[in-house]
Amino acid sequence: MSKKLLAVIDMQNDFITGALGNAQCRAVVSNVVKKVNHTDADIVYTLDTHGEDYPDTQEGRKLPVKHCIKGTPGWELIPELEHIQEKTHFEKNTFGSTHLAEWIRKQGYTEVELIGVCTDICVISNAMTIKAFNPEVEISVDAGCCAGVTPQSHKTALDAMKGCQIRIEE
C-alpha cells in the first residue's frame, strides 16, 4: 500500500516577497497553493530558520542577506499557506534537513513529492538528503510548483535531480 507525503519547502515570506524574494518565486505561489489544497497526501513543511547570529555563520558570510530570522514576519509561512501551520514541520538552519529525512523513514512513506523554493538550493538539498536516507522511496519534484534563484539555476537543479533518479513532473 502506498503512503504519500507532500513536502512543502521554505514557502516563507522572505523567499517570496521579502529579503530574498524574486519574480520566479512569486510566480509559483498559486500553483503551490493549488497543489496543497488538492492533494490526497499527508503534508509536511520546512522553515528555513536562522538566529540573530546569522551574519556570523558560514552561510551568512557567503550570503550576507539576513533572512528567515526566527520570530520575524519574514520567517513565517506565506499568508496563502497559513492554513497548514498546524501540520508537522521542521525548522532547519541549513539547506537540507536530516531530521525530515529520518522522520520520513520512521513514518514509512513510500512516495514523497517536493514543492517550494528555491529549487537550486533547499529543494534539491532536501530531495537528495531524503533520497540518501530513503533509497527505496519514490521521490518526485513538481517543477511547476518550484522556483529557483534564476530560471537557469532552476533548470540546472531539475536536471541534476533527474540524473539522481528523482522524478521531475513538468
Model-predicted segments: where are they?
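A short glycine-rich beta-strand->turn/loop micro-motif centered on a GG-aromatic cluster
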Residues: 113-117, 137-149
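Active-site beta-loop-alpha junctions enriched in small/polar residues
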Residues: 48, 95, 144-146
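Active-site acidic carboxylates
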Residues: 1-89, 149, 155, 159-163, ...
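Internal catalytic-core helix/loop-beta-alpha segment
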Residues: 71-121
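Short acidic/polar active-site loop segments enriched in Thr and Asp
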Residues: 41, 110, 137
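Histidine-anchored nucleotide/phosphate-binding helix
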Residues: 32-38, 124-134
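Short active-site-adjacent structural elements
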Residues: 121-124, 148-151
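Short phosphate-binding/catalytic loops that engage adenosine nucleotides
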Residues: 109, 135, 166
